[in-house]
């Protein structure tokens, strides 16, 4: 899956 730290911490 795509991991976007801006929306949620990976």
From Swiss-Prot:
Compartments, record wording: Secreted
Predominant location: secreted
GO cellular component: extracellular region
Cysteines joined through disulfide linkages: 3-10
UniProt-listed GO biological process terms: defense response; positive regulation of leukocyte proliferation
Keywords, sorted A to Z: Amphibian defense peptide, Disulfide bond, Secreted
Function summary: Induces mouse splenocyte proliferation through binding to CCK-BR.
Name of protein: Riparin-1.1
Species name: Crinia riparia
